[in-house]
Amino acid sequence: FNLNVCVGGMGLYRVTPEREVQRVTDETNRSWASINDDSRLRLADDLDIADDGRIFFSEATVRYEMHEWPVDGLEARGNGRIVCYDPRDGSTRTVLRGLRFPNGICVATDRQSILFAETWGCCIKRYWFDGPRAGQVEMVLDNLPGYPDNINLASDGNYWLALVGMRAPAYDLAMRMPGFRKRMAQRVALDEWLFPNIN
């Protein structure tokens, strides 16, 4: 069998049993309203595969490179997206935009939806890709005590959720004050910025 992997800064790749590395995709459809070309995959992060072979994967941010993730957090905008690669026709398309650092994804037990973690949103959401609710998004867990970094289906049908760090009141307050964040970015050295409590 092949191993499909998300490689930050490069895209979606496949490793064959013979250890051959193949690029599956490194771009998706461009946002029609975007001034900047956002078709290149900057930070492909996590993936899962639907029963029909479609690969759903998260791209944490379309604005920043891997080493610039703190700036994405400070900006506190929905720069992330969920992308789908369909091996049946070789197409890649964005299925959800405007997400706050989607950083973890898994096909749900219903096999018609995916669960994904939004790190800066401190939440888990569901996106229905098949069935009567196809295209809908719903909140599953909101206001988590920490920053979710991954979600996986457990062998017993439940889910494992990893938190990369716990929330801090000072950072939560700063996220509600865009003027404060802007002044901090302009006047304070990067290594002294207020950051989330990441392990």
Which stretches of residues belong to each language-model region?
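Conserved beta-strand positions in repeat-built beta-propeller and related beta-rich domains
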Residues: 1-9, 55-66, 108, 114-121, ...
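Asp-box/WD-like beta-propeller blade repeats and closely related beta-sheet repeat scaffolds
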Residues: 2-71, 79
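Short, conserved, GDST-rich strand-edge loop motifs in beta-rich repeat architectures
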Residues: 3-6, 57-77, 164-199
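Beta-rich catalytic cores
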Residues: 8, 42-43, 78, 101-103, ...
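Short loop/turn segments that connect beta-strands within beta-propeller blades
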Residues: 16-20, 85-90, 128-133
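Surface loop/turn motifs at the tips and blade-to-blade linkers of beta-strand repeat domains
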Residues: 24-40, 94-100, 139-145
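Residue-level detector of Asp-centered blade-edge/turn motifs that repeat once per structural unit
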Residues: 49-52, 109-111, 153-156
